[in-house]
Amino acid sequence: MSIRPVKRLVKAKPTLEGAGVHLRRAFGFGNTSDFDPFLLLDDFRNDQPRDYLAGFPWHPHRGIETITYVLAGTVEHGDSMGNRGAIAAGDIQWMTAGSGIIHQEMPKGDPDGRMHGFQLWANLPSSLKMMPPRYQEVKAVEIPVITDDDGTRVRVVCGNFWGKTGPVEGIAADPIYIDVSIPPGKRKTLPVETTRHAFAYVFEGAGKFCNASEPLAVPTEGVGWADTAPPAEADNRSLVLFDRGDELTVQAGDAGIRFLLVSGKPLQEPVAWYGPIVMNTQEQLRQAFQELEQGTFLKSEARG
C-alpha cells in the first residue's frame, strides 16, 4: 500500500459571488488540472443573513455538473426545465447543465440565521457537453452513514465506499464524495484509488495528514510521526490536495476533524472556461455566449 503524500495545502479564499454572497473558494477559476475532473469548490457558510440572502439569481450554465450539499439552512432552487425545490440541511442537489440550463439558487438561514453548504463543479467530457440537462434532489435520509469501531463516521454522498454506495449516481466524473468525521485523537487510513485525483476539505476541527509516500512512515498512535517530511496540519477551511497513492492517513486533533474527501478520474481534456460556462475550445465558448445573447442558448424545453 502506498500513502498519498500531500501535494499542496491552501486556505480557502474569501470571495463574492452571485448578487453579493460572501463565501470561501477552496479552488477554481485558475489552472485546475491538478483537480481534474473537478473545477471548483465553494464553501458558503455564514451566520449573517445580509451576507447571503441576495443569493444567486437566474444565471446560465453549460458543460458542467454541480453537486450542492447543504449542512444548515436551505437553498431554494428553480430552473428553466421547470424544476422547483428546496435543499434542506443534509440534502444533496445534483444538476447536469449539459447543453444549457438557466437557474437560480436562493439561500435561506435556519432559525438562528445560519447558512452552510458546499458546491462542487465537475467537468463534463467533450462527448457529453451538449447532453440534455437533468436534475436530482436527494434527501438526507437517503444518504448512507457508516460508523466504524473507533467512532469514525462517514456519509457516502457519491460512489462506493466501505461497501456502501451513495444515492447520487450517473455523474460523468464518477466521483467518490464522502463526508468524514474522525473523533479526537484518532488516526484513520482511508482508501483512494490510485488512478484518481483526490483532495480533502476540512471544515470542522483540525488534524494532521501524513506527508510520506512510504508505508513505513505511518505513525503509531501515541508515538508520533516517523516520516522525514513533517505531516501537513490542516484546520478549518483548509484544502489538502494529495499526490499519487492508494490511501491517505489522517490524525485527528484534540477537537476531532471533519472533512469532505473527494476523488475522481481525470478527463485530461482541454478546458475553455468563462464564468458559468465550461467548454473545450474558445470557439465553443464564444458560441455559447452568442447564443445567450440571441436567445437560442436553451436546447431543452421546460416540462409542462
Question: Over which residues does each language-model region extend?
Answer:
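Jelly-roll (double-stranded beta-helix
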Residues: 1-304
